[in-house]
Regions:
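Active-site/ligand-binding-proximal alpha/beta "capping" segment
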Residues: 89-124, 131
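A cross-family phosphate/adenosyl-ligand binding-site feature
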Residues: 1-97, 114, 135-179
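Arginine/glycine-rich "motif VI" loop of SF2 helicases in the C-terminal RecA-like domain
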Residues: 54, 121-128, 154-155
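Flexible, glycine/proline-enriched loop segments at strand-loop-helix junctions
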Residues: 104-105, 129-133, 160-163
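Short, positively charged, low-complexity/disordered linker segments
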Residues: 123-141
């Protein structure tokens, strides 16, 4: 795996564990020689993940829509910053640059990115591994919903089985590398 696409909150959330997880993921990926592709902002969990990867000597590519770039939220120290026209182009560019996807805790934008990656895999538009970095049960309600949707016949069981859910960086990265 050359690059990992990280979906993460643009805020830090309410628990220190979220920030710790973002830093651990960035540093852990860099220590394994895995670059990070992400939304390009300096703030929130996404910024913390990028900072940690950069501090560990890793490659970090940010992909930022022009509208957000105009608000001056771009991370100033990235290996590379790509400015794209739309949020749709951002997701497509991140997917094209990455070999796997991981979601950290986040809000609607993070879930939008995650669900698009899951949907593309379900439709066989890619076969890239997808992981959730489970931090203090953050994704438990989402996983419960997905199991319910599968029980009701709306989500294939194979889609659920394709999502690696781990609470430690080494186990998460190992699961993505060995899928």
């Amino acid at each position: 795996m050359k690059r990992l696409c990280v979906f993460a909150g643009s805020s830090k959330g309410s628990k220190a564990a979220y920030a710790e997880a973002a830093r651990a993921l960035g540093a852990g990926a860099a220590q394994r020689g895995v670059g990070i592709v992400y939304g390009g902002a300096a703030q929130g969990l996404m910024g913390l993940c990028a900072d940690a990867a950069l501090a560990a000597g890793g490659e970090v590519i940010g992909v930022l829509p022009q509208a957000l770039s105009d608000r001056e939220i771009a991370h100033p120290r990235l290996t590379e910053l790509r400015i794209v026209g739309t949020l749709h182009a951002r997701k497509a560019t991140m997917a094209a640059l990455a070999d796997a996807f991981v979601a950290l805790p986040g809000g609607c934008g993070t879930l939008d990115e995650l669900f698009e990656a899951i949907t593309w895999r379900q439709l066989s538009l890619h076969a890239k591994p997808i992981g959730l970095f489970e931090v203090e049960g953050y994704f438990a309600p989402l996983l419960s919903f997905l199991r319910s949707a599968a029980d009701e016949g709306f989500v294939p069981r194979a889609t659920l089985a394709a999502i690696a859910v781990r609470s430690e960086v080494p186990a998460l990265l190992d699961s993505l590398l060995h899928e």
